[in-house]
Design a protein with these regions (language model features):
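Flavin-dependent oxidoreductase catalytic cores
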Residues: 1-297
Length: 297
């Protein structure tokens, strides 16, 4: 082996969990364990694909992200016991490879939720949205830190999450992590204070105009993310490792205006100076690992 590659095959730790090497498969669409729009569904094809990657020697596998409450605002991910009963024997087989597996749990999309014209029409009409909510709750699916324009639909504005909705979601992050640990999963990754997704919308001052405990100071804007890791440790144990998907810099010039590499611009989102403060807050809250990138799509 070329000596410059030797470090790839050395172990490292995330919290107390040792990863056998430094080859990591990050989350990608189409690689989920619990499906996407199918509530309470264990994806056998996705599971087989991930198991093969572990057999091929990948040290850590992160399946595609799982929204903590299904995309249309109906079922919570922790609500179906059968799904976790199927997961347990799968994890027993998976661990025979020596690889570790973290599940990426998502706090939703907020203003980044892709909507069709008919969904935007529902979201703009309180009565129609209420009538349709047992099937699709567009207003909940697009809810964000504050009233902000949808990324894809000019004529739809996200409503702010209530404090009660935030705290309900925080609790379900903990409940889901507990069930995942009981099923043999090695850790979780929280999606995400990155790329303009929902938790990132809370974290960025120009997207968060709240005056309660989830807005204002950097500590308050990160409170949603820090309460999640604290609740996970409360329910799943302090030694259960939690990673965070994180964008070091937002690289945005304004609403729907991205910056190109090496371009000179005034940062609309999170800059490096703020990021250096943010990572300390997140680490002190209990995150064991930051899975970092740059930019916002």
């Amino acid at each position: 082996m070329n000596p410059k590659y030797e470090a790839l095959f050395t172990p490292f730790k995330i919290g107390e969990v040792e990863i056998p090497n430094r080859i990591v498969q990050c989350s990608m669409g189409g690689t989920t364990l619990f499906g996407w729009l199918e509530p309470s569904h264990f994806d056998l094809e996705g599971a087989d694909f991930l198991l093969q990657r572990a057999k091929d020697g990948v040290g850590l596998v992160l399946p595609g992200m799982q929204v903590i409450r299904d995309t249309m605002g109906r079922k919570w991910l922790d609500s179906n016991r059968q799904m976790y009963r199927v997961l347990k024997p799968y994890m027993d087989e998976y661990h025979k490879t020596g690889s570790k597996l973290f599940i990426q749990l998502a706090g939703g999309f907020g203003r980044s939720m892709a909507v069709t014209p008919w969904m935007a029409a529902l979201g703009r009409n309180d009565l129609l949205n209420k009538l349709a909510s047992p099937i699709v709750d567009v207003q909940y699916a697009c809810a964000s830190a504050s009233a902000t324009p949808n990324r894809w639909a000019d004529n739809l504005t996200s409503r702010p999450f209530t404090v009660e909705e935030i705290q309900e979601m925080v609790w379900h992050f903990g409940a889901t992590a507990k069930k995942l640990r009981e099923a043999g999963v090695d850790g979780v990754e929280i999606h995400a204070v990155h790329e303009g997704y929902n938790l990132d919308q809370f974290a960025i001052a120009n997207m968060n105009f709240r005056t309660d405990q989830y807005g204002g100071s950097l500590e308050n804007r990160l409170r949603f993310a820090t309460e999640i890791v604290q609740e996970i440790h409360e329910q799943a144990g302090d030694d259960f490792p939690v990673s965070l998907r994180y964008s070091v810099r937002s690289c945005t010039k304004g609403w729907r205006k991205g910056a190109m590499p090496y371009e000179e611009f005034e940062e609309f989102g999170r800059d490096m100076a703020e990021s250096e403060k943010a990572v300390k807050i997140l680490q002190d809250a209990g995150y064991a690992f930051l899975n970092c990138d740059n930019g916002t799509y």
